[in-house]
Amino acid sequence: MAISALEHATPDMIGTGGATGAGATAILAEIAALLERVAAGGEAVQIDLCGPTCSPQIRAKLLQALGPGEVLIRLKADGESTIRETSVQGVWWNEHTDRYGNLLAAFLEVARVPAILPVDSEQLRRGAERLRADLQTVSKTVD
């Protein structure tokens, strides 16, 4: 499920004008509620950090407030996807850039595990086939 950064925030939480602290506070309050919901068995949620309600200043305040965690994952394809654990367990900072480094998407994911990481059954089967083929090649050169 994806939501905008301030979907459930009340007007007094959002603030006005340059009050980026108030906007970040609203998002952090939303994250706390989402963590409780996911812990109770609810589905994972993504909070869009590139929408019109989430300025670069708010993103910077969120990044500072959430702090770095222990896990950093980089996926390289046509661009780069970076998934960073924050210091708040269950909150993941995701950014996707094109091959030139331009930011395409940024979102916070409240989840046990980021959605991009688990592999499906078909991917597991292909992995087993590849490993078996590699083992045949290795065993011919070792034996």
At which residue positions do the language-model features occur?
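Short, well-structured hydrophobic secondary-structure segments
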Residues: L34-L66
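Intrinsic-disorder-associated interaction segments
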Residues: G17-A24, S55, L117, L124
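Amphipathic, interaction-prone secondary-structure segments
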Residues: Q57-S87
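Helix-rich interaction surfaces within compact, conserved domain-sized segments
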Residues: I3, E7, D78, R84-D143
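Beta-strand-enriched cores of mature, soluble protein domains
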Residues: I31-A32, L75, N102
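Generic detector of well-ordered alpha-helical segments enriched in charged/polar residues
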Residues: T25-E36, L63, R125-R132, Q136-S139
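Short, hydrophobic/aromatic-rich segments at coil-to-beta transitions
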Residues: A44, E70-V71, V91-W92
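N-terminal, charge-rich interaction modules
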Residues: M1-A44, T141
